[in-house]
Regions:
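GST superfamily/GST-like fold recognition
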Residues: 153-177, 185-192, 197
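GST-like domain detector, emphasizing the conserved glutathione-binding G-site
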Residues: 1-152, 222-224, 231
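Residue-level detector of short coil/turn "hinge" positions at structural boundaries
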Residues: 32, 181, 204-205
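C-terminal helix/juxtamembrane-tail motif
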Residues: 211-231
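Substrate-binding/catalytic groove segments of enzymes
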Residues: 147, 171-177, 203-206
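Conserved, non-catalytic sequence blocks in retroelement Pol enzymes and Pol-derived host proteins
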Residues: 63, 182-184
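Acidic-histidine catalytic/liganding microenvironments
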Residues: 200
Length: 231
């Protein structure tokens, strides 16, 4: 692969946002180089590639950087127009996918992050809020994607990528912080999508190492709680 056509992903191993891009690249069968970034000690290279946000992920293609995970995913789909296509051809279906992706990004991810760093009454309140928002997502999946079948890579699109990257490690989160957010009784459709997606070989290739993730979550949680106690 010459330097001009080379594809490089700058990310971090535990990042949901990086994981989204990894999944898309593997689904499309795109060869790429992965660069692990240390966000506590950002490299000059990362800052130059993403001078506005100075964050990962950044995809470099044809020596040109593309930042922000959702922007990168659409760039991948438009540049490599081979199966699976990440967005449907029908404008209304495409709008629905983008709406629910936005909902997860803006309404669900934030409250789930709060749960990790809270305890007691504050955490219980956030857990309830997270479950309520997931129930809205559940109803949306049943209404707009009632016949969804997930058996192979071609059944995976943008929404499925966001779901598995966001919720794929929910059992590990349960183990690490002792709270179950994705409840099969409350959100059976969402739970089923996650289970089916996890069975695909491509998802197993990008699965986060359980022990390492548990240790990271518990470490972050304890550090945050200690800082809050000392504030």
């Amino acid at each position: 692969m010459d330097e001009k056509s080379k594809v490089t992903l700058h990310g971090t191993w535990a990042s949901t946002y990086s994981k989204r891009v990894e999944i898309a690249l593997k689904l499309k069968g795109i060869l790429y180089e992965y660069v692990e970034e240390d966000l506590k000690n950002k490299t000059e290279s990362l800052i130059q590639l993403n001078p506005v946000h100075k964050k990962i992920p950044v995809l470099v293609h044809d020596v040109k950087p593309v930042a922000e995970s959702l922007v990168i995913l659409e760039y991948i789909d438009e540049t490599w127009q081979k199966s699976p296509r990440l967005l449907p051809e029908d404008p209304y279906e495409r709008a629905q996918v983008r709406f629910w992706v936005s909902y997860i990004n803006q309404q669900v991810f934030e409250v789930m992050s709060r749960v990790i760093f809270q305890e007691g009454e504050a955490q219980a309140k956030s857990v309830e809020e997270a479950r309520e928002r997931l129930k809205v997502l559940e109803d949306g999946l049943k209404k707009h994607f009632p016949n969804k079948i997930i058996r192979e890579n071609d059944d995976v699109g943008l929404l499925e990528i966001i779901i598995i990257a966001t919720f794929g490690a929910h059992k590990v989160y349960h183990e690490a912080i002792g709270v179950e957010i994705v409840d099969p009784a409350n959100t059976p459709t969402l739970y089923n999508w996650i289970e089916r997606l996890q069975e695909l070989p491509v998802m197993k290739d990008v699965e986060l190492p359980r022990d390492r993730l548990v240790n990271l979550l518990q470490s972050y949680r304890q550090k945050h709680l200690q800082q809050a106690a000392n504030a």
